[in-house]
Amino acid sequence: MKNLILIALLAPIAVFAQKIDVNKQFKLAEQQYQRMLAAQPDTSVTVHSANHDGTYRNMPSKWWCSGFFPGGLWQLYERSHNAQWEKAARLWTAAVKKEQYNTGTHDLGFMMFDSFGNGLRLTKDPEYKKVLIQSAKSLATRFDPNIGLIKSWNSFKGGYKYPVIIDNMMNLDLLFWASKETGDPSFKQIALTHADNTMK
Protein backbone atom coordinates (compact mmCIF):
# COMPACT_ATOMS: atom_id res chain seq x y z
CA MET A 1 0.00 0.00 0.00
CA LYS A 2 2.86 2.38 0.80
CA ASN A 3 4.31 1.73 -2.65
CA LEU A 4 1.02 2.66 -4.32
CA ILE A 5 0.81 5.90 -2.39
CA LEU A 6 4.41 6.74 -3.31
CA ILE A 7 3.73 6.02 -6.98
CA ALA A 8 0.59 8.18 -6.89
CA LEU A 9 2.55 11.06 -5.38
CA LEU A 10 5.50 10.80 -7.76
CA ALA A 11 3.60 10.18 -11.00
CA PRO A 12 2.74 13.86 -11.64
CA ILE A 13 6.39 14.81 -11.13
CA ALA A 14 7.53 12.14 -13.60
CA VAL A 15 5.04 13.32 -16.21
CA PHE A 16 6.03 16.96 -15.68
CA ALA A 17 9.70 16.06 -16.12
CA GLN A 18 8.95 14.47 -19.51
CA LYS A 19 7.54 17.49 -21.30
CA ILE A 20 7.57 17.14 -25.05
CA ASP A 21 8.37 20.06 -27.30
CA VAL A 22 5.45 19.66 -29.71
CA ASN A 23 6.73 22.32 -32.11
CA LYS A 24 10.06 20.52 -32.35
CA GLN A 25 8.31 17.22 -33.06
CA PHE A 26 6.21 18.77 -35.82
CA LYS A 27 9.34 20.28 -37.39
CA LEU A 28 10.91 16.82 -37.38
CA ALA A 29 7.75 15.34 -38.92
CA GLU A 30 7.81 18.02 -41.64
CA GLN A 31 11.42 17.16 -42.46
CA GLN A 32 10.63 13.45 -42.65
CA TYR A 33 7.57 14.00 -44.84
CA GLN A 34 9.52 16.33 -47.15
CA ARG A 35 12.14 13.60 -47.61
CA MET A 36 9.49 10.99 -48.31
CA LEU A 37 7.69 13.22 -50.81
CA ALA A 38 10.95 13.97 -52.63
CA ALA A 39 11.97 10.31 -52.72
CA GLN A 40 8.52 8.95 -53.59
CA PRO A 41 6.70 11.10 -56.15
CA ASP A 42 4.71 8.11 -57.47
CA THR A 43 1.24 8.25 -55.90
CA SER A 44 0.20 4.96 -57.50
CA VAL A 45 1.82 3.23 -54.52
CA THR A 46 1.74 3.94 -50.78
CA VAL A 47 4.86 4.58 -48.73
CA HIS A 48 5.23 1.66 -46.32
CA SER A 49 8.63 2.12 -44.68
CA ALA A 50 12.20 3.19 -45.29
CA ASN A 51 14.87 0.68 -46.23
CA HIS A 52 18.41 0.85 -44.87
CA ASP A 53 19.69 2.23 -48.18
CA GLY A 54 17.31 5.20 -48.07
CA THR A 55 14.84 3.83 -50.58
CA TYR A 56 11.25 3.18 -49.63
CA ARG A 57 9.20 0.02 -49.50
CA ASN A 58 5.89 0.61 -51.23
CA MET A 59 2.48 -1.02 -51.07
CA PRO A 60 -0.65 -0.77 -53.24
CA SER A 61 -3.52 1.50 -52.20
CA LYS A 62 -5.51 -1.53 -51.01
CA TRP A 63 -2.99 -1.95 -48.15
CA TRP A 64 -4.73 -1.40 -44.81
CA CYS A 65 -2.43 1.50 -43.84
CA SER A 66 -2.73 3.38 -47.14
CA GLY A 67 -4.65 6.24 -45.53
CA PHE A 68 -2.04 6.95 -42.88
CA PHE A 69 0.43 8.77 -45.16
CA PRO A 70 -2.14 11.25 -46.52
CA GLY A 71 -3.61 11.48 -43.03
CA GLY A 72 -0.22 12.60 -41.72
CA LEU A 73 -0.02 15.20 -44.47
CA TRP A 74 -3.43 16.54 -43.43
CA GLN A 75 -2.17 16.76 -39.84
CA LEU A 76 0.83 18.81 -41.00
CA TYR A 77 -1.49 21.10 -42.95
CA GLU A 78 -3.77 21.54 -39.95
CA ARG A 79 -0.84 22.46 -37.75
CA SER A 80 0.95 24.81 -40.16
CA HIS A 81 -1.75 26.07 -42.59
CA ASN A 82 0.98 25.76 -45.21
CA ALA A 83 -0.49 25.34 -48.69
CA GLN A 84 2.27 22.89 -49.68
CA TRP A 85 0.93 20.38 -47.15
CA GLU A 86 -2.63 20.80 -48.35
CA LYS A 87 -1.52 20.24 -51.95
CA ALA A 88 0.43 17.10 -51.01
CA ALA A 89 -2.41 15.84 -48.82
CA ARG A 90 -4.94 16.26 -51.63
CA LEU A 91 -2.64 14.47 -54.08
CA TRP A 92 -1.99 11.48 -51.79
CA THR A 93 -5.62 11.36 -50.64
CA ALA A 94 -6.72 11.09 -54.27
CA ALA A 95 -4.37 8.12 -54.61
CA VAL A 96 -6.57 6.00 -52.32
CA LYS A 97 -9.90 7.21 -53.74
CA LYS A 98 -10.56 3.99 -55.65
CA GLU A 99 -10.60 2.07 -52.35
CA GLN A 100 -14.04 3.51 -51.61
CA TYR A 101 -15.34 0.57 -53.65
CA ASN A 102 -13.15 -2.03 -51.94
CA THR A 103 -15.49 -4.62 -50.42
CA GLY A 104 -12.66 -7.04 -49.67
CA THR A 105 -11.40 -5.44 -46.47
CA HIS A 106 -12.65 -4.50 -43.02
CA ASP A 107 -10.06 -1.70 -42.82
CA LEU A 108 -11.87 0.99 -44.79
CA GLY A 109 -12.13 3.12 -41.67
CA PHE A 110 -8.33 3.26 -41.41
CA MET A 111 -7.85 3.76 -45.10
CA MET A 112 -10.53 6.35 -45.79
CA PHE A 113 -11.15 8.20 -42.53
CA ASP A 114 -7.48 9.08 -42.04
CA SER A 115 -7.23 10.43 -45.58
CA PHE A 116 -10.66 11.61 -46.74
CA GLY A 117 -11.99 12.12 -43.23
CA ASN A 118 -9.23 14.52 -42.28
CA GLY A 119 -9.51 16.17 -45.68
CA LEU A 120 -13.25 16.71 -45.20
CA ARG A 121 -12.78 17.99 -41.67
CA LEU A 122 -10.20 20.55 -42.78
CA THR A 123 -11.51 21.63 -46.19
CA LYS A 124 -15.25 20.78 -46.20
CA ASP A 125 -14.73 19.42 -49.74
CA PRO A 126 -18.12 17.85 -50.65
CA GLU A 127 -16.41 15.27 -52.88
CA TYR A 128 -14.64 13.87 -49.82
CA LYS A 129 -18.00 13.38 -48.12
CA LYS A 130 -19.28 11.38 -51.10
CA VAL A 131 -16.21 9.16 -51.02
CA LEU A 132 -16.64 8.50 -47.31
CA ILE A 133 -20.31 7.59 -47.70
CA GLN A 134 -19.47 5.15 -50.49
CA SER A 135 -16.69 3.73 -48.30
CA ALA A 136 -19.21 3.10 -45.53
CA LYS A 137 -21.50 1.36 -48.02
CA SER A 138 -18.62 -0.86 -49.09
CA LEU A 139 -17.72 -1.69 -45.49
CA ALA A 140 -21.36 -2.49 -44.75
CA THR A 141 -21.32 -5.22 -47.41
CA ARG A 142 -19.01 -7.24 -45.16
CA PHE A 143 -21.71 -7.47 -42.48
CA ASP A 144 -23.73 -10.69 -42.34
CA PRO A 145 -27.04 -10.07 -40.52
CA ASN A 146 -27.39 -13.79 -39.74
CA ILE A 147 -24.03 -13.84 -37.96
CA GLY A 148 -24.23 -10.24 -36.75
CA LEU A 149 -20.59 -9.42 -37.48
CA ILE A 150 -18.42 -7.70 -40.06
CA LYS A 151 -16.13 -10.25 -41.69
CA SER A 152 -12.45 -9.39 -41.34
CA TRP A 153 -11.18 -11.30 -44.34
CA ASN A 154 -12.60 -13.54 -46.98
CA SER A 155 -12.06 -17.26 -46.36
CA PHE A 156 -8.46 -18.38 -46.59
CA LYS A 157 -6.37 -21.49 -46.08
CA GLY A 158 -6.44 -22.58 -42.48
CA GLY A 159 -10.10 -23.40 -42.25
CA TYR A 160 -11.54 -20.10 -41.04
CA LYS A 161 -14.89 -19.55 -42.71
CA TYR A 162 -15.85 -16.21 -41.15
CA PRO A 163 -12.79 -14.68 -39.46
CA VAL A 164 -13.43 -11.70 -37.18
CA ILE A 165 -10.65 -9.84 -35.37
CA ILE A 166 -10.80 -7.10 -32.76
CA ASP A 167 -9.35 -4.59 -35.25
CA ASN A 168 -12.79 -4.37 -36.87
CA MET A 169 -13.88 -2.29 -33.89
CA MET A 170 -11.51 0.49 -34.93
CA ASN A 171 -13.31 0.86 -38.25
CA LEU A 172 -16.80 1.32 -36.84
CA ASP A 173 -16.41 5.11 -36.61
CA LEU A 174 -16.88 5.27 -40.37
CA LEU A 175 -20.28 3.59 -40.05
CA PHE A 176 -21.40 5.81 -37.16
CA TRP A 177 -20.30 8.89 -39.11
CA ALA A 178 -22.14 7.75 -42.26
CA SER A 179 -25.32 7.15 -40.30
CA LYS A 180 -25.18 10.65 -38.85
CA GLU A 181 -24.34 12.30 -42.18
CA THR A 182 -26.89 10.44 -44.31
CA GLY A 183 -29.67 9.88 -41.79
CA ASP A 184 -29.55 6.17 -42.66
CA PRO A 185 -29.79 4.23 -39.38
CA SER A 186 -28.61 0.97 -40.98
CA PHE A 187 -24.95 2.01 -40.76
CA LYS A 188 -25.28 2.68 -37.03
CA GLN A 189 -27.20 -0.55 -36.51
CA ILE A 190 -24.49 -2.58 -38.22
CA ALA A 191 -21.83 -0.94 -36.05
CA LEU A 192 -23.78 -1.49 -32.83
CA THR A 193 -24.65 -5.10 -33.67
CA HIS A 194 -21.05 -5.85 -34.54
CA ALA A 195 -19.81 -4.25 -31.32
CA ASP A 196 -22.36 -6.10 -29.18
CA ASN A 197 -21.49 -9.44 -30.76
CA THR A 198 -17.76 -8.79 -30.49
CA MET A 199 -18.17 -8.44 -26.72
CA LYS A 200 -19.78 -11.88 -26.47
What residue ranges belong to the model's regions?
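Glycan-recognition and catalytic cores of secretory/periplasmic carbohydrate-active enzymes
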Residues: 18-200
